[in-house]
C-alpha cells in the first residue's frame, strides 16, 4: 500500500463493482482475509453482531478480534434471529449487524434472505451476506443470490470469493464508498500483507469477463438443470432422509462416523467420482458427510450413476 495501487487493481475493482451493481469492490488476497479483515474492524465496541451458528470459520475468527458483542442464532432460523435481535432494537444506540451466508458451504442450504432484509430494513440493522458459494451459480450472469433476489441495495456488505466458481485466487468486499475507504485504512489483513500479483488480477478479470458473457452460453442453465435433476433423483431413489435439502450446487449426504464416510468416499473413487468426505471435527460428530459439488459439465447419466452407487453402498 505504501507504493500505491497497481492500475490493474483500480480497473478490476471497478469491473467487479459494475458487474454486481454496487458502489465499490475492495479486493483481498483470499476469502479468509476478507472476512477476518472486515469483521475484526467494522463492528465497534458498543455494537452487536448476530450471526448464523454455521457461518464460515473465517467470520468467527474475525469476530473474535472484534470488540463488539456477538450472539449466534439458530441455523437459517429467521424467527430465532427476530426474537433475539428485536430485544435490542429499541433504544439501542450502537450498530447492529446481522451476518449470514447465501449458500452454506457444508450444507448447501440457504436462508430466507428476503425476510432477513425485511427485519434489517425495519430496525435499521446492517445485513452482511457471504456469497462465496453463490457467485457463478445464481442470478443473472451468475451474480449471486443477493442479486437474483434484488437485494443488492438492501445489504450493507457482500463478501465474494474467486476460488470457487471462478477458479482463481482472491476475494472482494462489496459495499459503499465509505466502507471501501474505511477498510483500506483499518483492515489489517489488507494492509499488512503482500498484495496479489498482477497475473492474479488478470485471472479475476478474465473470470468476470466469462460471467459477463454467460447469457451467450448454456453453462448456467445447464448447471441449474443438473441441480434440478439431482434433486429429482434423490427423491426418486428415496434418499431424502440422508441428504441435506439444497437448491444450490452443493449437496451433502450424511454418513455418520469418520471411518464410514471415508470408506464410502473410497468406493466412489473406484467409480471415478472425486467426492471428498467431510469429517468430524469440521462438522459435528454423527453428521459426517459426503459433499457433492455439481458442475455444468456433469451429465445426467453421471448424476444418476453416483446416486445409484450411494444407494448400493450406504447401509
Indicate where each model-derived feature is located.
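Structural motif of enzymes handling amino- and sulfur-group chemistry
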Residues: 195-216, 222, 226
